[in-house]
Amino acid sequence: MRNLLFSNPHKDPELSALASCMPEAVYPAFQDAVTAHGLLSSDDFSLLLAARLLTETKESLSSYLDLSPDLANRILRQRHACSSFSEFALQLKTKEMTYTRISRALMHLLLNQKTLYPAGYNRVLGFRKSAGALLKEIKRRSSLPLITKAADAPRLLTGDALAAFESDIQASLFYETVRSHKTGTPFVHEYTKKLVLL
C-alpha cells in the first residue's frame, strides 16, 4: 500500500488502486480521510530533519532512542548530504542496520524521544455508539486508566504514564503541524479533536 501511495511524490495517489488491498467497508472511510486530511510521508519531514541535524553532537545524538554511537558518527559525517529523509536513511543504511531501524531512530531524533515509557494508559479514539456498554465495562475492568478525552489525561495520569501521554501528544502535534502546512488546512490541536462515533 505504501508503495502505491508514495510511488510518485509529484502526483496525487490513485486511491482506487488501493480498493482491493482493504475490506470493502473500509475503503470509503479511507478515501474520505485522505481527501480531507492528505497523506504525509517521511520526506515531508526532510527540512525539519536537516535543520535539527545542524544542532546535534555525537553525545546528543547518542541520547535518542535507537540511536547508537556508530549511527551518530555516520549521521554527523553525512548530515550535510541530507537532501530528503528517505534518501538520508538510505545513505546511512548498512548490512548491520536496516533502513527501518534508521528511519525509526531519525524519527526519535525529530520527536526528541530519549525514553521508552511503559504502556501506562489506554486511549479510545473512536467507537460505535452501540458499543457504549462494552466501553463502560472496559473502563470498569481495566487496570490502566482509559482516556476518552485528551484534555482529561493530566488529571487521570501520573509519573511515566503521564510522560508517555505527553510524548504521544507532542508527536501528534508535530505531525499535525506538518500536515497543516502541507495541505493548507487548519491546524487541529490534539486536545480539541473529537472522539469518532460511528
PLM-predicted stretches and their roles:
Residues 2-198:
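Active-site cores that bind ATP or allylic diphosphates and position pyrophosphate for catalysis
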